[in-house]
Amino acid sequence: HLADLCVRNKQYDRARELLQLSLQKRPDLIRELPIIAQACMAQGNFDRANELFSDYLDRVDGAERAYYDDITFIGSEGEIAAYAATANREERREFLRRFWTGRDAVPATPVNERLLEHYRRVWVAWNRYGEHQSPWDRRGEIYIRYGEPDYRARSDEIDFVKSADMRVQRVKERLALGLYGSEFVINVSSLHQGPVYPVRGTGQSPQIVAAGGSSQVPWESWIYFGLGGGIEVTFT
């Protein structure tokens, strides 16, 4: 969707303009609502984003709504079990109300920004990482858990400028130190473009490709600076 591409490129006004034109012609459209909501969130208009997401979720079927209500990737074991034990829709709604109230970082505002962020993450997981696996692949799961990564690279698309960011290098060097020892870090610290954790080759070859190498296996690597001193998640 062109408007989604605009949102990804931070062209929020353009995204809203495109979608408002579509909705003027077809008020019955609902797939555009979460995209407008994301543009509103990025511009700080959480009230409008809340209206749009609420309208969207009220109009989708129960199976789709269930993905947005699911707390599997964000709740504790006890919370997940308690939610699964709810007997009916009313109990589930009350449980979710209390669950999200407890996670509202700014309770003084009329909108629960963390809940909106969850809706945004689920939408992204479904629409960007569900092409080969329904409703989404492992990237979608991690995205729902942790949100937008601070850095990402793919085997066919490495941003050499961003990969030189000292924050990226510090995370990679710390992880490499734990995996391979200080000698490895000293020798190849300038080559940390690929994943630190080894990616195995295909076929009969036991080849293992580490940071800075090449691989026949497509991979995608995400880094989160603020988790556990910095973590890297690699998908193959």
State what each model feature region is.
Residues 1-236:
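Scaffold/interface architecture of coatomer-like assemblies
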